[in-house]
């Protein structure tokens, strides 16, 4: 994920999906004292460790 540019909609979708995964019991990929899934997902996004990819259509 590092070095890639995401639209604000892609970022929102990625963070939301990751927060849901964390809420449902997925392992947290960073060390943190926070228990809020959204805060954890945002920090993971900032650090570039979220294991989610974005597939885009080729530009025409």
From Swiss-Prot:
<dbReference type="InterPro" id="IPR006111">
    <property type="entry name" value="Rpo6/Rpb6"/>
</dbReference>
<dbReference type="InterPro" id="IPR036161">
    <property type="entry name" value="RPB6/omega-like_sf"/>
</dbReference>
<dbReference type="InterPro" id="IPR020708">
    <property type="entry name" value="DNA-dir_RNA_polK_14-18kDa_CS"/>
</dbReference>
<dbReference type="GO" id="GO:0006360">
    <property type="term" value="P:transcription by RNA polymerase I"/>
</dbReference>
<keyword id="KW-0808">Transferase</keyword>
<dbReference type="InterPro" id="IPR006110">
    <property type="entry name" value="Pol_omega/Rpo6/RPB6"/>
</dbReference>
<dbReference type="GO" id="GO:0042797">
    <property type="term" value="P:tRNA transcription by RNA polymerase III"/>
</dbReference>
<dbReference type="GO" id="GO:0003899">
    <property type="term" value="F:DNA-directed RNA polymerase activity"/>
</dbReference>
<keyword id="KW-0548">Nucleotidyltransferase</keyword>
<keyword id="KW-0804">Transcription</keyword>
<protein>
    <recommendedName>
        <fullName>DNA-directed RNA polymerase subunit Rpo6</fullName>
        <ecNumber>2.7.7.6</ecNumber>
    </recommendedName>
</protein>
<dbReference type="GO" id="GO:0005737">
    <property type="term" value="C:cytoplasm"/>
</dbReference>
<dbReference type="GO" id="GO:0000428">
    <property type="term" value="C:DNA-directed RNA polymerase complex"/>
</dbReference>
<comment type="subunit">
    <text>Part of the RNA polymerase complex.</text>
</comment>
<keyword id="KW-0240">DNA-directed RNA polymerase</keyword>
<comment type="similarity">
    <text>Belongs to the archaeal Rpo6/eukaryotic RPB6 RNA polymerase subunit family.</text>
</comment>
<keyword id="KW-0963">Cytoplasm</keyword>
<dbReference type="Pfam" id="PF01192">
    <property type="entry name" value="RNA_pol_Rpb6"/>
</dbReference>
<dbReference type="GO" id="GO:0006366">
    <property type="term" value="P:transcription by RNA polymerase II"/>
</dbReference>
<comment type="function">
    <text>DNA-dependent RNA polymerase (RNAP) catalyzes the transcription of DNA into RNA using the four ribonucleoside triphosphates as substrates.</text>
</comment>
<dbReference type="GO" id="GO:0003677">
    <property type="term" value="F:DNA binding"/>
</dbReference>
């Amino acid at each position: 994920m590092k070095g890639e540019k995401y639209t604000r909609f892609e970022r929102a979708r990625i963070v939301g999906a990751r927060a849901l995964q964390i809420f449902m019991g997925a392992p947290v990929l960073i060390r943190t004292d926070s228990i809020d899934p959204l805060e954890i997902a945002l920090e993971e996004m900032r650090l570039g460790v979220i294991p989610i990819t974005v597939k885009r259509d080729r530009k025409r």
